[in-house]
From Swiss-Prot:
Residues 315-346 are annotated as: Disordered. Ubiquitinated and targeted for proteasomal degradation. This is Cullin-associated NEDD8-dissociated protein 2. One of its GO terms (molecular function) is TBP-class protein binding. PANTHER family: TIP120. SUPFAM superfamilies: ARM repeat. It comes from Homo sapiens (Human).
Length: 1236
């Protein structure tokens, strides 16, 4: 017998003792053993433990009973299934015992066992088998109404089972429904309440037929409001419908037109409990079926407005003293009794609370009605801030906060530049409400109730975030409220932290001048909080003090407030926190950060305290725990424009920082490099040379491609040091350059690192005398290309040539006197017949950059060389020469542009390359310098719009787009006219040209483009397929980059867009390829473009979409071509995250095409490509399934549950699903999709 088995055997023996203490201790020890992961019971031990614990459930001692029932939880996952069934059978029998205590213990035991069983989603069938076993016994217990206690326990357990395992119990759903429905008529409230909960869970999991039966039963039982019926019966039915709405509202949509008018009528009956139930049902319907509730929104809004004020027992005075209320006598009849309405009978607060929650659901589910809500709901909510019941007041605040969040304008530069009309109107209305809100909250901010004040702070924080600056004129009221809460030591610390957090937010949203008059009374309580003994308050107060310093005495603006009266106290209280050694880590870090801000912003006013403070920062720099915040604080001090004297700490700080560069901790390295760069910029020649050498010795190891960000900061620092102390670079320039040149040969070089390298190279040759000779640097840069030409080594990546060319140009710009000779040498290399392809490519790319610096010395020769290269057999040489011709031409338009236009006319075979050159010239030249040539270019381009090659037409379109930017107000109307005048290829080219006018950055053409965009979008009705495809690509670009251009047009555009998602049989044809027939769908590219537009709309215009209509077309796409299915799978996944409620309504229809894709088989004998395509389709479909499974209630769908079970039972699908879940966990941010 193993040790564990022997120990358990001895415990079982003790459990038979007559001494209750022995039995209790033995059961407690058994509990400890069962909770160990390592314990394994043999079959005999299992049987004995189960038998003993079931026996102890009937123990005479209650404490032993309770401990035994707790042991069942860990036991059921350690024993075999038949033992679990034995436990469950015994518990079910005990539930029907005559002994009340045993019944109670059995009920608790069943709940414990069910809660510990592994869920069905894990693939274990244990829970399902156990639940099936006890369902029959539970239904019989519920049906026999002899013992209400047994009924209640059984209903509780059944409700719990249905919530966790509703779908696997499908075989019992019909019997459960017929068992539960009669309980709605039970005379006992508790039975009715539990039956309502169980029916809600059943409604979410049952089949469609059973759900219809349930809904019809409930609706048929609902009488008309004038039919005499028991109020209790009506209440129960409405509560049941509300429960069904909450659990399975997505299935109730089809019944709402019949149901909602009845519930509206019942709301008007004089029964507050019934009103509460009706409003709760409306809330559920609005959240789960917002589209179907659309026609009923006006009536529901009216009822909410009526009942949020429903307080028959009180009269709120209308004068300023809103806290004094006056009670009136009133009669209230409830269930045929006529008693005086007293506070004890007052149920009206529940009605008001339900109305407030329903209003919150209204606002969140119908963002399209926001302007109406601002007019109708907002004033009423503001007036109800005076609500006397704390719970109701909290929900009123929540409802107004939901309104604020819906009003929040979309984030990003575009909306900041140009608010959409609707958003601007909403913000304007909200701005008018601000004085009313502040007035309504003035007394609440000093309310005795902590919860009321917390609600005020939350609401005002949201308001400040939506309308920054709007609270400035109300600062006296707000400061008074903040001080009241900061001084409140009688309540919990939470309210003081909330007040500090609110103040911190205000400092970020309101202008600094608003705080100036209040600082004398505001600063003392903040500093008292800094010194508070509770670490969380101290940490929060230090952040506020830091924000005060940053906001009131900004670095780069004149000081509008004299800091002298405050700086001493602020410094003293922060230093006290900084010096303490036994502090919480968070307080230490925030004290260091706060001191960094104090020194950086007000160091010139610290006087004699400055040096001790700096030394204290240096001490924190030595400490491993505080070194990271100390580095950041030192950086703040270094970048300060106050030019503080850092000599007392400089040498030692540099040596410490140098040691950090050796640490294998990325965050530390990045912070250290930022600090070093700041110190080099601010201190320059003051840096001790020996300390600088110690730092520089660590840098070569950091300049490599293993961490590009670290490399970029290291090179930036090198450039700064080169300018500040050139002599320091003498010893390390060799190793550093060696690493930098290796880095420049990386094909993955980011733009930031390249820019840093250019700056460093310019610094090296820009010093006097230069640290490294210009000619030597050029030689080092170009050596890899020339060496490759000699030894025939592996070719460099194309991107490397561009990087090297940029560096050559940077050096030429830093040494203009050398530029001409460099250009001459490059021309020779490009012309030489002995030069390799790589040398020529580098020469042309370098000329493209250097040519604009070198001047006109070699232009004639250069033209000839470039033209000759356009005929090179090497595609890379031709492309580089084309690029160089355009870039050099942009620097000398009078010489090059007429020549380039002549060549385009004269050389039709080289037209594509020459048009690329023209595109580069148009993009690089100044608009004003191009105006004299605009007409000639315009005519030339439109002559080439009808070219046969689509690639050439694409370049022509891009050239037209760049040309329009030269003179938008004149050329954009001309471009629009070409739509009517041109043939199909011309129309397509014009639309593509307009696409190139849209960038992801603000541009002066945007307002003009917006005024014309509707006319360009009319091309969606063009009879030509290619024109419609080009228009969809243009629309997609607008939606993706500048959604405000098209938002106002969506009502007209969306029907046309959806039309393009349909498969058109007249565009499908058969093509014979030898003995085979091949189907060609000419409409595929247009459909694909339409679905790409739909995806982009999800990201930027979600609020303007009718998601139910949108989903109709997504469903069609799920059965379309491979490319479109891939797109719609991604859309389904995104929709599951963005708007789960409407997706849940359609989940049964969405699952079938996903299942079909996941289970599809490739025909035997298919090529490898077909297998790869099918695998990719399966992965994409499974990602969509995984996203659908994140919707909280989706598991209750029978079809989804069936498919989940199919996935688990199929090894291939299970492995795929597991792989996708791992991918999602490791890379959660997969929201965006690159679309061509």
């Amino acid at each position: 017998m193993s040790t564990a088995a022997f120990h358990i055997s001895s415990l079982l023996e003790k459990m038979t003792s007559s001494d209750k203490d022995f039995r209790f201790m033995a059961t407690s020890d058994l509990m400890s053993e069962l909770q160990k992961d390592s314990i394994q019971l043999d079959e005999d031990s299992e049987r004995k433990v189960v038998k003993m614990l079931l026996r102890l459930l009937e123990d005479k001692n209650g404490e032993v009973q309770n401990l035994a029932v707790k042991c069942l939880g860990p036991l059921v996952v350690k024993v075999k299934e038949y033992q679990v069934e034995t436990i469950v059978d015994t518990l079910c029998t005990n539930m029907r015992s005559d002994k009340e205590q045993l019944r109670d213990i059995a009920g608790i035991g069943l709940k414990t066992v069910l809660s510990e069983l592994p869920p069905a989603a894990t693939g274990s069938g244990l829970a399902t088998n156990v639940c099936r076993k006890i369902t029959g016994q539970l239904t019989s217990a519920i049906a026999q109404q002899e013992d209400v206690a047994v009924q209640l326990e059984a209903l509780d357990i059944l409700s719990d089972m249905l919530s966790r395992l509703g779908v696997p119990l499908g075989a019992f759903h019909a019997s459960l429904l017929h068992c539960l429905l009669p309980q709605l008529s039970s005379p006992r409230l508790a039975v009715r309440k539990r039956a309502v909960g169980a029916l809600g869970h059943l409604a979410a999991a049952c089949s469609t037929d059973l759900f219809v039966e349930l809904a019809d039963h409930l609706l048929d039982r609902l009488p008309g409001p004038r039919v005499p019926t028991s109020p209790t019966a009506i209440r129960t039915l409405i509560q049941c419908l509300g429960s069904v709405g909450r659990q399975a509202g997505h299935r109730l949509g089809a019944h709402l037109d019949r149901l909602v008018p009845l519930v509206e009528d019942f709301c008007n009956l004089d029964d507050d409990e019934l009103r509460e139930s009706c409003l709760q049902a409306f809330e559920a319907f609005l959240r789960k079926c917002p589209k179907e509730m659309g026609p009923h929104v006006p009536n529901v809004t009216s009822l909410c407005l009526q009942y949020i004020k429903h307080d028959p027992n009180y009269n709120y005075d209308s004068d300023e003293d809103e806290e004094q209320m006056e009670t009136e006598d009133s009669e209230f009849s409830e269930q045929e009794s006529e008693d005086e309405y007293s506070d004890d009978d007052d149920m009206s607060w529940k009605v008001r609370r339900a109305a407030a929650k329903c209003i919150a659901a209204l606002i969140s589910s119908r963002p399209d009605l926001l302007p109406d809500f601002h007019c109708t709901l907002a004033p009423v909510l503001i007036r109800r801030f005076k609500e006397r019941e704390e719970n109701v007041k909290a929900d009123v605040f929540t409802a107004y906060i939901v309104l604020l969040r819906q009003t929040q304008p979309p984030k990003g530069w575009l909306e900041a530049m140009e608010e959409p009309t609707q958003t601007g109107s909403n913000l304007h209305m909200l701005r008018g409400q601000v004085p009313l809100v502040v007035k309504a909250l003035q007394r609440q901010l000093k309310d005795r109730s902590v919860r009321a004040r917390q609600g005020c702070f939350s609401l005002l924080t949201e308001l400040a975030g939506v309308l920054p600056g709007s609270l400035a004129e109300h600062m006296p009221v707000l400061v008074s409220g903040i001080i009241f809460s900061l001084a409140d030591r009688s309540s919990s610390s939470t309210i003081r932290m909330d007040a500090l957090a609110f103040l911190q937010g205000l400092l970020g949203t309101e202008p600094a001048e608003a705080f100036h008059p209040h600082l004398p009374i505001l600063l003392p309580p903040v500093m008292a909080c800094v010194a508070d003994s509770f670490y969380k308050i101290a940490a929060e107060a230090l952040v506020v003090l830091q924000e005060l310093v940053r906001a009131l005495w900004p670095l780069h603006r004149p000081r509008m407030l004299d800091p002298e009266p405050y700086v001493g106290e602020m410094s003293a209280v922060t230093l006290a926190r900084l010096r303490a050694t036994d502090l919480d880590q968070e307080v230490k870090e925030r004290a260091i950060s706060c001191m960094g801000h104090l020194v950086g912003h007000l160091g010139d006013r610290l006087g004699d305290d400055l040096e001790p403070t700096l030394l204290l920062l240096l001490d924190r720099l030595r400490n491993e725990i505080t070194r990271l915040p100390a580095i950041k604080a030192l950086t703040l001090v270094a970048v300060s424009p106050l030019q503080l004297d850092l000599q007392p700490i400089l040498a030692e700080a540099l040596h410490i920082l140098a040691s950090f560069l050796r640490k294998n901790q990325r965050a530390l390295r990045l912070a250290t490099l930022a600090a070093l760069d700041a110190l080099a910029q601010s201190q320059g020649l003051s840096l001790p040379p020996s300390a600088v050498q110690a730092v520089l010795a660590e840098l070569p190891a950091l300049v490599n491609e293993s961490d590009m960000h670290v490399a970029q900061l290291a090179v930036d620092f090198l450039a700064t040091v080169t300018q500040a102390q050139p002599a320091s670079l003498v010893e390390v320039s060799g190793p550093v350059l060696s690493e930098l040149l290796r880095l420049l040969r990386s094909p993955l070089l980011p733009a930031g690192v390249l820019a840093a390298a250019e700056g460093f190279l310019q610094a090296l040759v820009g010093t006097r005398p230069p640290c490294v000779d210009y000619a030597k640097l050029i030689s080092l840069l170009t050596a890899p290309v020339y060496e490759q030409a000699v030894d025939g080594g592996p070719g460099l990546h194309k991107q490397v040539f561009h990087s090297l060319a940029r560096c050559v140009a940077a050096l030429s710009a830093a040494c203009p006197q050398e530029a001409a000779s460099t250009a001459s040498r490059l021309v020779c290399d490009a012309r030489s017949p002995h030069s390799s392809t790589g040398v020529k490519v580098l020469a042309f790319l370098s000329l493209a950059e250097v040519g604009q610096v070198a001047g006109p010395g070699h232009q004639r020769e250069l033209k000839a060389v470039l033209l000759e290269a356009l005929g090179s057999p090497s595609e890379d040489v031709r492309a580089a020469a084309s690029y160089a011709l355009g870039r050099v031409g942009a620097g000398s338009l009078p010489d090059f542009l007429p020549f380039l236009l002549e060549q385009i006319e004269a050389e039709p075979r080289r037209q594509y390359l020459l048009l690329h050159s023209l595109r580069e010239a148009l993009g690089a030249a100044q608009p004003d310098s191009l105006k004299p040539y605009a007409e000639d270019i315009w005519a030339l381009l439109f002559q080439r719009c009808e070219g046969a090659e689509e690639g050439t037409r694409g370049v022509v379109a891009e050239c037209i787009g760049k040309l329009v930017l030269v003179n938008p107000s004149f050329l954009l109307p001309r471009l629009r006219k070409q739509l009517a005048a041109g043939r199909p290829h011309t129309r397509s080219t014009v639309i593509t040209a307009v696409k190139f006018l849209i960038s992801d950055q603000p541009h002066p053409i945007d307002p003009l483009l917006k005024s014309f965009i509707g006319e360009f979008m009319e091309s969606l009705q063009d009879p030509d397929l290619n024109v419609r495809r080009a228009t969809l690509a243009f629309f997609n670009s607008a939606v993706h980059n500048k959604p405000s251009l098209v938002r106002d047009l969506l009502d007209d555009i969306l029907p046309l867009l959806y039309q393009e998602t349909k498969i058109r049989r007249d565009l499908i044809r058969e093509v014979e390829m030898g003995p085979f027939k091949h189907t060609v769908d000419d409409g595929l590219d247009v459909r694909k473009a339409a679905f790409e537009c739909m995806y982009s709309l999800l990201e930027s215009c979600l609020g303007q979409l009718d998601i139910c209509e949108f989903l109709n077309h997504v469903e069609d796409g799920l059965k379309d071509h491979y490319d479109i299915r891939m797109l719609t799978f991604i859309m389904v996944a995104r929709l599951a995250t963005l708007c789960p409620a409407p997706v849940l309504q359609r989940v049964d229809r969405l699952i079938e095409p996903l299942r079909a894709t996941c289970t599809a088989k490739v025909k035997a004998g298919s090529v490898k490509q077909e297998f790869e395509k099918q695998d990719e389709l399966k992965r994409s479909a499974m990602r969509a399934v995984a996203a659908l499974l994140t919707i909280p209630e989706v598991g209750k769908s029978p079809i989804m549950a069936d498919f989940s079970s199919q996935i688990r039972s199929n090894p291939e699908l299970a492995a795929l699903f597991e792989s996708i879940q791992k991918d999602s966990a490791s890379a959660p941010s997969t929201d965006s999709m690159e679309l061509s």
